[in-house]
Amino acid sequence: MSKPSNTPPLPKDGERNILITSALPYVNNVPHLGNIIGCVLSADVYARYCRLKNYNCIYICGTDEYGTATETKALSEGCTPKEICDKYHEIHKEIYEWFNISFDKFGRTSTNSQTEIAQDIFNKIKDNGYTLTQEIEQLYCEQTCKMFLADRFVEGTCPHCKFEDARGDQCDGCSKLLNPTELINPRCKVCSKPPVIKSTKHIFIDLPQLQQQVDQFVETNSKGGNWSENSIAITNTWVKGELKPRCITRDLKWGTPVPMEEFKDKVFYVWFDAPIGYISITAEYTNEWEKWWKNPENVKLVQFMGKDNVPFHTVIFPASLIGSKDNYTLLNNLSTTEFLNYETGKFSKSRNTGVFGDGAKATGIPSEVWRFYLLNNRPESSDSIFSWDDFNFKNNELLNNFGNLVNRVLKMLNTNAAFNGVVPKIGELNEVDKKLVQEVDEHLVQYFQKLEEISLKEGLKIAMSISKLGNTYMQDNKPWDLSGKDNERCGQVLAILINLIKLLSTLLEPYIPSLTDKVHQQLNVEPTKYSTHFDINAIPAGHEISKEILPLVKKIEADDLKKWRTKFSGIGPEFPIDMKIATVLEVNDHPSAENLYVIKLSLGGDQTKTAVSGIKANFEKSQLIGKKLAVVLNLKPSKFKGVLSEAMILVADDGQATKESLSFLVPSNPQSIEAGSKIAGKGMSIKPKPTIDYQKEFLHYDLTCIDKIISYNKSQLFINQNEPLVSEKIGNGKVR
């Protein structure tokens, strides 16, 4: 009953029409648990609640696909931005499906609808006089790339906290927003060369002209929309005093084109463009999207996001819509979360720290347990920390409180010969029964109040408190002792508990829908909408429950907890090979062997090594000079016809024994990689053995080339933990 409609709902006069959005996840990585609880999962609970209340609602989300992060990710993986977006859109979609996220539409921003709607909003803002153009100083890569560097194409030292790998738009060390020109010792992310400062013309949204309208919007909607204190504080840092013009264009190719001849080589900045994705994704869902997005009188817009996204949704996006003067539906309710951190620090895919969506699935723990844990620990007012001990504690709470209540009651009804799985008559209630009904009804009032306020964590606690009331009622009335002695009272207790379980399955459906589906199956009933009171006859006497009663939740074993804590701690498997990128300086014929080259390699700075290699039949000298390629440096040095070889050049071999059978292993983007750069799998601990015997050890390592991707023990190898190592020519083969 909390699932989306088969046909797109539209707003209706006289009904509650709620438009729900979750912050659009970016497509440059896999979502971690903090991303999931901060946006899509929280919005999913509220959307399911609204459907169970018979509110007219839709839940819209999708991948945010334009901007510098996509272009830089595409460079690092050696593919196009479109290919990156396709890949990560599917990854996100699969993870959210596994987590049972009930979008009405999960779309993407790289669509024609996005271009049309974003350009239309911009043109209206411009025509209404709310834009201006200014020349700004911007970093330009003059040595290699010959292009202006948008924010994420620049890295350097943060001027505030001195973090050395701050991005041009924000520092990951102190979270402060930055301009690229503020960085100390900036460097181009593509080629690592220092850029210069040049002037370039950009378009700004003239926020000072919109100040009064934005102030009024914030004043009215922050109070009426239940914004958190932190969200209001973050917004006020922007609007208190005086708003400043905000640049809305970037020197990029991957994005929504600016519809002006003078700026035809520029695209819209992601934080002007991305929130419009909510609108364009709705337009992909229904042709009548304007009935949702241009209907502020009848539609409430409820948006979910992490605290770092607040100012773009409370200032930039509303200001853009106000400036268009096109009667857009503006943000009403804002539900934000603080940060969820991992027990050993921040989530990091590259360092294998923390649980990401794909990792959660790989544990084999059902998604409902993850949902239950995350929603119990939703960081609503302060940052929270994921810990495996607490995860185990919450799993036991779900098992012992709700899971055992369902299992005990249904099994007792099935195994008692007096009932044989058929719900008994309840008859007249005694004072104990009436007290239970009264307490449950009081809890229901609180439950609905908290869900209306979008206090999701409190709503879950209240539902579990009702389950606890059921357990206490069962313990106090001891139906196992009544069986055979007073079957009428035994049946009455079980029938009341059966109906309490049905009520609980509806209350918990927004939180753990797959698990409550199982409860409905075992009760042999269809899901229903909410009831505002405890109906003890919702499942009538004479109804037969399922004969197959299975445990809903399993205990987590201590050994599994230990295994997962180690797996996600950032302590990866050891990589025993000293593998680096080298640049070929010289290639000479071996003085005593016709089939060998003697190759001089640079490993950065003044460090050089000599490699004697049997690749002469496959490559001309001219094909090697200046090439950046992978080498192994900890093989036992060997003499070949009197010449000492200190390194081995790696190749992929397709086994066909032709001149084209060998392929060098190279960076996917050689310009960005320096000689001496280390190679290993992400999250691996690089611990080279002092020496490796080629015949006895190296040939037995699982080094493979599949679809040009180089892997060790089925883990992809990267240069500097970021740049993929790939085969230059052949697609599949053995690495040697």
Curated annotation (Swiss-Prot):
GO terms for biological process: methionyl-tRNA aminoacylation. Residues 573-680 form the tRNA-binding domain. A motif ('HIGH' region) lies at residues 25-35. InterPro entries: aa-tRNA-synth_I_CS (IPR001412), Anticodon_Met (IPR041872), Met-tRNA_ligase_1 (IPR023458), Met-tRNA_synth (IPR014758), Methionyl/Leucyl_tRNA_Synth (IPR015413), MetRS_core (IPR033911), MetRS_Zn (IPR029038), NA-bd_OB-fold (IPR012340). It is found in: Cytoplasm. It is an enzyme of class 6 (ligase). One of its GO terms (molecular function) is methionine-tRNA ligase activity. Keywords: Aminoacyl-tRNA synthetase, ATP-binding, Cytoplasm, Ligase, Nucleotide-binding, Protein biosynthesis, RNA-binding, tRNA-binding. It comes from the Eukaryota. Belongs to the class-I aminoacyl-tRNA synthetase family. PANTHER family: METHIONINE--TRNA LIGASE, METHIONINE--TRNA LIGASE, CYTOPLASMIC. This is Probable methionine--tRNA ligase, cytoplasmic.
